[in-house]
Design a protein with these regions (language model features):
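Active-site beta->alpha loop and helix N-cap motifs at the rims of alpha/beta catalytic domains
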Residues: 22-171, 314
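Bacterial Sec-dependent signal peptides at the C-terminal "C-region" and cleavage site
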Residues: 8-23
């Protein structure tokens, strides 16, 4: 009997069934962690871990780091690896149902593979079953560049990878046909897509990508979730990827209601509350960090509202920067008046009252 059990166990591991179970959990809000800094501009890894734990406390399905531009471009290789290691250590010591996702983004294939190999090494040493995320190569120019980049990643990755479709205006977004082809040829690695095209273009692309089911498992909404409700109800997206950790309570409620389907009771109201929270226009509006940093401070997760900001700007919106300019940063602080803080506080308090009435923790 012991031999039979051992044979079945080896067979299950060998067929990748553990990864398949993991893959079934890759949906819902996968929130990108904002990078916290000390007063001297160095990365505050302790607060990074606290931020991830806050999301996990609200049953956020997944968290991702490093994935936003500033966390990729303005951090050194050593800083990115140190943050990844800190998060893996937290998941090792305090296992969570929230799926940890490590970004292995690279300027080119060589750099991406370095991060992917380091991530796999961390997985082997820690035993933590995290997944990966990767945007296209920063200096990619053609769809062939993108194809070769993701094919190379598939030779290293032993776990699911979420493909983010956008990096900058100089690198094209991978076509739906390419994304479907990758999902079909590498079913244990690809099939999870963060569709980050701008505005209405995203809707057309999401529909095309979902034509690739069942190889395509999940298409995530993006861009802060402005169209998340429409894209879920009318198109069939199954999650959101955005830098919105401070709003984990309301995103978890929205997802709870989305999963109910026709039995949902407050989905429209919950989504309206979420939209209110992320679209306050009486302050300087930054869709990624901005006043979300204030909420993280208010929650005791962050110590300040400091950010690394690009010193050099591209010649045109969302263009690429030369390698020597891409990593240059200055330390800036988001500032709010007492009146602005008072209104933000009132909004967050109202959000939490709504969440506490409707969310089943």
């Amino acid at each position: 009997m012991k031999r039979i059990f051992l044979f079945l166990f080896v067979a299950l591991v060998g067929c990748g069934c553990t990864e398949q179970v993991q893959g079934e959990r890759i949906e819902g809000p996968f929130l990108i962690l904002s990078t916290p800094y000390y007063e001297d501009g160095s990365v505050n890894y302790e607060n990074l871990v606290k931020e991830a734990c806050f999301a996990a406390q609200w049953n956020t399905p997944g968290v991702i780091w490093p994935q936003s531009n500033d966390a990729i471009d303005l951090l050194t290789v050593e800083e990115r690896l140190a943050g990844m290691a800190a998060l893996v250590e937290e998941w090792k010591n305090n296992p969570k149902s929230t799926v940890l996702t490590l970004g292995v983004n690279g300027d080119d294939t060589e750099e991406m593979l370095m991060f992917a190999r380091e991530a796999e090494r961390m997985a082997d040493e820690s035993g933590v079953d995290f997944i990966l995320a990767a945007r296209p190569p920063y200096y990619g120019k053609t769809e062939q560049d993108i194809k070769e980049y993701y094919e190379a990643l598939a030779t290293v990755a032993k776990r699911p990878v979420i493909i983010q479709t956008y990096v900058n205006e100089d690198c094209p977004a991978p076509s739906a046909a390419l994304l479907i082809d990758l999902a079909q040829r590498y079913p244990d690695v690809y099939g999870w897509i963060k569709e980050e095209s701008n505005k209405l273009e995203a809707n057309d692309r999401q529909q095309a990508e979902l034509e690739g089911k069942p190889a395509v498992k999940t298409v995530f909404s993006a861009w802060g979730g402005w169209q998340w409700l429409y894209q879920r109800r009318q198109i069939g997206t199954a999650g959101l990827i955005s830098e919105k950790i401070a709003y984990a309570p309301i995103t978890s409620l929205v997802w709870q209601e989305m999963k109910k389907g026709e039995n949902e009771t407050c989905l429209t109201e919950a989504f309206a509350m979420y939209r209110l929270m992320i679209d306050q226009r009486f302050v300087i509006h930054d869709s990624l960090r901005g006043y979300g940093l204030y909420y993280l401070m208010r929650l005791g997760v962050f110590d300040n509202m400091l950010s690394r900001s690009y010193t050099v700007q591209p010649d045109y919106p969302n263009g690429s920067l030369a390698q020597e300019d891409k990593c240059k940063w200055t330390l800036t602080e988001f500032e709010l008046s007492d009146m602005q803080k008072a209104e933000l506080n009132k909004c967050y308090d109202d959000m939490m009252k709504f969440v506490n009435r409707h969310y089943k923790r």
